[in-house]
UniProtKB/Swiss-Prot annotation:
The keyword rRNA processing applies. HAMAP family: 16SrRNA_methyltr_H (MF_01007). The keyword Iron-sulfur does not apply. It comes from Pseudomonas putida (strain ATCC 700007 / DSM 6899 / JCM 31910 / BCRC 17059 / LMG 24140 / F1). It is found in: Cytoplasm. This is Ribosomal RNA small subunit methyltransferase H. One of its GO terms (molecular function) is rRNA (cytosine-N4-)-methyltransferase activity. NCBIfam families: 16S rRNA (cytosine(1402)-N(4))-methyltransferase RsmH (TIGR00006).
Length: 315
């Protein structure tokens, strides 16, 4: 996630994430979530002439920023694809199993969140969109207009962890029958009224909006696919660093890494004769989970939920 402070984009866990990759001057690296390029620029500053960096993003504004960087630095290439598709891109470039490190900085960036026209925020009124790539998939407004009440409730509960999901979904459906939702502030107001127990210091629409955004962009599905693709792309000794911003993301990352540290025995029937190597771990964890420092928290309050996990490929 990139924090936007006025006109300055401040990347969360910038130094920590780049350090975690243990960069080699001639290595090949992937930034799966280019954003506004904070991590990528620091990586490039540490690579030598033979180093390479491939950036991915779905957002057209991020791609424009990446294209400008690519024009300045021939070691960098930007690709408008989800990091879930990095396997195909890596294979097409002949880099499968040759990548030295992959960085995934998950979630929505502050420039996206703070731009009302992107439709992510309940604080700034804008069109109810929420798509990372406005040219692909259905918008939040389209989903809200057509989904059954049970599906809306599931999205609020499963992806937003909203305990009043059913009540809020029913309020949405009741209102849409009279007038469709097209604006973020309109939806936020209905959710606000339908939520009977506000959390201190948190907008009552927060969890439902998170659920909608995750669903519209298939964020958790992309994460699961992206983790597998990243591991396959890495060379032995290559590193994977993942920064997540809410418990659903972090749970997926943690379980993925835990499974690979233990080996694959948990996935096999008991007493099945297998070769010993099946039980050997595929990765090792590098340190413990890292969080934003006190100084970073003070400068960027949105970094408070950031957690980074790092692993190294063993085989």
């Amino acid at each position: 996630m990139t924090i936007d402070s006025g006109f300055n984009h401040i990347t969360v866990l910038l130094d920590e994430a780049v350090e975690a990759l243990a960069l080699r001057a001639d290595g090949c690296y992937l930034d799966g979530t280019f954003g506004r390029g904070g991590h990528s620029r620091l990586i490039l500053s540490k690579l030598g002439p033979q180093g390479r960096l491939l950036g991915f993003d779905k957002d057209p504004q991020a791609i424009a920023t990446g294209q400008a960087l690519a024009a300045e630095d021939g070691r960098f290439v930007i690709v408008q694809r989800s990091f879930a598709e990095l396997g195909a891109e890596v294979a097409a470039r002949g880099l499968h199993g040759k990548v030295s490190g992959v960085l995934l900085d998950l979630g929505v960036s502050s420039p996206q969140l703070d731009d009302p026209e992107r439709g992510f925020s309940f604080l700034n009124d804008g069109p109810l969109d929420m798509r990372m790539n406005p040219d692909q998939g259905i918008s939040a407004a389209e989903f809200i207009a057509t989904a059954p009440v049970e599906e809306i409730a599931r999205v609020f509960k499963e992806y937003g962890e909203e305990r009043f999901a059913g009540r809020m979904a029913r309020a949405v459906v009741e209102r849409r029958e009279k007038q469709p939702f097209t604006r973020t502030a309109d939806l936020a107001e209905v959710l606000k009224v339908a939520n009977p127990a506000w959390e201190k210091g948190k907008n009552p629409a927060t969890r439902a909006f998170q659920g909608l955004r995750i669903h519209v962009n298939n964020e958790l599905g992309d994460l699961e696919a992206g983790l597998e693709a990243a591991l396959d792309a890495l060379e032995v000794g290559g590193r994977l660093a993942v920064i997540s911003f809410h418990s659903l993301e972090d749970r997926i990352v943690k379980l993925f890494m835990r499974k690979l540290v233990k080996g694959e025995a948990d996935n096999l029937p008991r007493n099945l004769p297998v070769q010993h190597k099946v039980f050997e771990p595929k990765i090792k964890l590098i340190g413990k989970a890292q969080f934003a420092s006190e100084a970073e928290l003070k400068a960027n309050p949105r970094s408070r939920s950031a957690v980074m996990r790092v692993a190294e490929k063993l085989r």
